[in-house]
Curated annotation (Swiss-Prot):
Cell division as UniProt keyword: no
Primary residence: membrane
Extent of the signal sequence: 1-24
Pfam families tied to this protein: C1-set, MHC_II_alpha
Bilayer-crossing regions: 217-242
Record localization: Membrane
Annotated segments matching region Alpha-2: 110-203
Protein name: H-2 class II histocompatibility antigen, I-E alpha chain
Membrane-side (Extracellular) residue stretches: 25-216
Record organism: Mus musculus (Mouse)
Region (Alpha-1): 25-109
Gene Ontology CC: external side of plasma membrane; lysosome; MHC class II protein complex; plasma membrane
MF GO annotations: peptide antigen binding
Length: 254
């Protein structure tokens, strides 16, 4: 299967160096927006907008709507998704022309890397969020699925669009809101063209092993012993202090 990728990228900066390269550009803030389209069965492509490396929104190709990273952003401004959809369509058209008019070498499929971790320290019974971070994605076509006790989970799942790395690969984050329980185990399932088979990244809460009755007894005994020693030592110091004070106040011979 031959696949090709074309990226359309425009970067806006507050201060630009006209003659320097990317590493020579100095800017207070950088806004990045662009499209990514690639040859593949079905309608695949995306339009994203980032500011200082953080995604603000993307255009959902299936739902044909603007998806804000934080709902509050959508209350401050707006973006017509038709603009992003039009740019995606233009990019696909240009891609087909490039493929027909040139001899291209299909890009190699890279094997993505996944990591799963909780957003906050885990406490049983307290709501939390699991994050599946998938990096080194190329081409940007991937399926990320959450499993709880080996069963698919769809409620409480949210994922970002494909975010561009400096080496032109992509990364994506998938979130799962959950309530930690010592009865549940979770897996992040990753499917990609660069993998011979799906990869499962396992996670389960690390619950400290309960202390045995003997251990609890020993700990309590040690604590009591330390407390008694402290009382005895403190009493000795107090007595010595009183004696020293009495001696210093005793009148000497005339």
């Amino acid at each position: 299967r031959s696949r090709a990728l074309i990226l359309g990228v425009l970067a806006l900066t507050t201060m630009l160096s006209l003659c320097g390269g990317e590493d020579d550009i100095e800017a207070d803030h950088v806004a990045f927006y662009g499209i990514s389209v690639y040859q593949s069965p079905g309608d695949i492509g995306q339009y994203t907008f980032e500011f200082d490396g953080d995604e603000l929104f993307y255009v959902d190709l299936d739902k044909k709507e603007t998806v804000w990273m934080l709902p509050e952003f959508g209350q401050l401004t707006s973006f017509d998704p038709q603009g992003g959809l039009q740019e995606i369509a233009t990019g696909k058209y240009n891609l087909e022309i490039l493929i027909k008019d040139s001899n291209f070498t299909p890009a190699a499929n890279e094997a993505p890397q996944a990591t799963v971790f909780p957003k906050s320290p885990v406490l049983l019974g307290q709501p939390n969020t699991l994050i599946c971070f998938v990096d080194n994605i190329f081409p940007p076509v991937i399926n990320i699925t959450w499993l709880r006790n080996s069963k698919s989970v769809t409620d409480g799942v949210y994922e970002t669009s494909f975010l561009v790395n400096r080496d032109h690969s992509f990364h994506k984050l998938s979130y799962l809101t959950f309530i930690p329980s010592d009865d549940d185990i979770y897996d992040c399932k990753v499917e990609h063209w660069g993998l011979e088979e799906p990869v499962l990244k396992h996670w389960e809460p690390e619950i400290p092993a309960p202390m045995s009755e003997l251990t609890e007894t020993v700990v309590c005994a040690l604590g009591l012993s330390v407390g008694l020693v402290g009382i005895v030592v403190g009493t000795i110091f107090i007595i010595q202090g009183l004696r020293s004070g009495g001696t210093s106040r005793h009148p000497g011979p005339l």
